[in-house]
Amino acid sequence: MSLLTEVETPIRNEWGCRCNDSSDPLVVAASIIGIVHLILWIIDRLFSKSIYRIFKHGLKRGPSTEGVPESMREEYREEQQNAVDADDGHFVSIELE
């Protein structure tokens, strides 16, 4: 008994494939899974950077400010800007002797 399910045999002067189990539900399911896997792999290769960025950071661009008074929003913006401004003056000077 052979473990092969497909046998290549000469049919009418051509090489063909005699697949008797092609209507088996397991073969159909495996074919569908293979096709879906191939499609998902292609999509992943084409759009990997944008897909992983969405998973990492979500669809939001920043912290939610819903329900926060405008004065607190402005204070938060000033704190963020001051933190950026403070970092601008910190440079390390290294001298080699």
From Swiss-Prot:
Gene name in the database record: M
Keyword Disulfide bond: yes
HAMAP family associated with the record: INFV_M2
Protein name as annotated: Matrix protein 2
Domain of life: Viruses
Ranges in the topological domain labelled Intravirion: 44-97
Keyword terms: Disulfide bond, Glycoprotein, Host cell membrane, Host membrane, Host-virus interaction, Hydrogen ion transport, Inhibition of host autophagy by virus, Ion channel, Ion transport, Lipoprotein, Membrane, Palmitate, Phosphoprotein, Signal-anchor, Transmembrane, Transmembrane helix, Transport, Viral ion channel, Virion
Protein function: Forms a proton-selective ion channel that is necessary for the efficient release of the viral genome during virus entry. After attaching to the cell surface, the virion enters the cell by endocytosis. Acidification of the endosome triggers M2 ion channel activity.
Topological domains, Virion surface: 1-22
Membrane-spanning parts: 23-43
Region described as Disordered: spans on this chain: 60-88
Compositionally biased intervals (Basic and acidic residues): 71-80
Phosphoserine: residues bearing it: S64, S93
Family: Belongs to the influenza viruses matrix protein M2 family.
InterPro entries: Flu_M2
Annotated site location: Essential for channel activity, possibly by being protonated during channel activation, and by forming the channel gate and the selective filter: H37
Compartment(s): Virion membrane; Host apical cell membrane
GO molecular function terms noted in the UniProt entry: monoatomic ion channel activity; proton transmembrane transporter activity
General remark: When the channel is activated, one or more imidazole moieties of His-37 probably become bi-protonated.
